[in-house]
Amino acid sequence: MNDVLTEPDPRTRDEIERALAVYFDGLHHGDVSRLAKVFHPAAVYATATEGTLTRLTMDEYFPIVDARPSPASRGEERRDSIASIHLAGPVTALAVVTLAMGPKRFTDLLTMIRLDDRWQIISKVFHYDLDES
């Protein structure tokens, strides 16, 4: 990418990919307990897709996830992928992922930190587009 961000070694990539799998599973199933395993308690959720800032704490975000019908419960096929993973340092990573839920196609910029021997999302900043179909 550049000389500031680097590619993770295979072991680190695997650890981050496993954390992202929990993230994808949690969103697809609307499972807040899974999401709580991958989000740091002080994490921030933010977007400006609709023209104003939406910024939530996990205490605000998790009840929203819990209250909405999950993609799995609606019979949706799972549509998620990892676009890139880069390190800013040994305990700081940026993962760019894509996923779709209903008519929304999301690009998530997930800043991750390694604390307590595991990778955790400390910020989720995202954009979404609506499917034309």
Residue ranges and their predicted role:
Residues 1-33, 37-41, 59-60, 131-133:
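Short, low-complexity N-terminal intrinsically disordered segments enriched in polar/charged residues
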Residues 15, 24, 44-105:
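Surface-exposed, charged secondary-structure patches
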Residues 31, 38, 49-51, 76, ...:
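Residue-level detector of alpha-helical recognition elements and their boundaries
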Residues 39-40, 99, 125-126:
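Short beta-strand segments enriched in hydrophobic/aromatic residues
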Residues 41, 90-91, 117-118:
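Beta-strand-connecting loop/turn residues
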Residues 94, 105-133:
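Short beta-strand edge/turn micro-motifs at domain boundaries
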